[in-house]
Design a protein with these regions (language model features):
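Intrinsic-disorder/low-complexity, polar/charged segments
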Residues: 24, 106-107, 175-180
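Broad hydrophobic/π-residue packing in well-ordered secondary structure
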Residues: 37, 111, 118-120, 167, ...
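Thiamine diphosphate
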Residues: 1-93, 98, 115, 134-135
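Conserved thiamine diphosphate
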Residues: 84-134, 146, 158-161
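Short secondary-structure transition/capping segments
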Residues: 42, 64-73, 94, 116-124, ...
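Conformationally flexible catalytic loops at phosphate/diphosphate-handling active centers
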Residues: 13, 128-180
Length: 181
């Protein structure tokens, strides 16, 4: 995504993607939440330790029915043994947040189900956690069949997208929000 943004590649909406690297994963999750409140479709990429720091904001995002996708490279959590192999204890610790979960087992599945996650979150207003093995799959070099924007664009629920953007915070139409909004 960094390379695509630097090259000025357009996303499915014809816009150049903005990549923002934060100092910590907790800050990244807060930035995702704020960006979603402002009406921007937002996603983040993280690994195990980072996901644990994002859990408080994940509750807020799910509770406010904000459509987003967290892509997670699942690995063993750091301990005295410092194991880098994959397991799902990080993802399982976030299962109670209200995020729907998709798991992949190959590089092609990561590509395919990432699109499914983004399309599904827009339609359902349920945030998604899209995760895969953070050692084997994330290091695998494999040819994949890319999903093209032209193929995905007709699948976007335009009405749900318009409703999401209409709910965005706007200084011209101020509102006070709490957990019931």
């Amino acid at each position: 995504v960094d390379e695509w943004a630097a090259a000025g590649r357009k996303n499915i909406f014809g816009e150049t993607v903005l990549v923002q690297e934060m100092q910590s994963e907790g800050g990244a999750a807060g930035a995702v939440h704020g960006s979603l409140q402002a009406g921007a479709l937002t996603t983040t990429y993280t690994a195990s330790q980072g996901l644990l720091l994002m859990i408080p904001n994940m509750y807020k995002i799910a509770g406010e029915f904000l459509p987003c996708v967290f892509h997670v490279s699942a690995r063993t959590l750091a301990s005295h043994a410092l194991c880098i192999f994959g397991d799902h204890q990080d993802v399982m610790s976030a299962r109670q947040t209200g995020f729907a979960m998709l798991a992949e087992g190959s590089v092609q599945e990561v590509m395919d189900l990432a699109g499914v996650a983004h399309l599904s979150t827009i339609k359902s207003r349920v945030p998604f956690m899209n995760f895969f093995d953070g050692f084997r799959t994330s290091h695998e070099i494999q040819k994949i069949e890319m999903l093209e924007n032209e193929d995905l664009a007709p699948l976007i629920d335009q009405e749900a997208l318009a409703e999401f953007r209409a709910r965005a915070l706007n200084p011209m139409n101020p509102v006070a929000r709490d957990r019931k909004s």
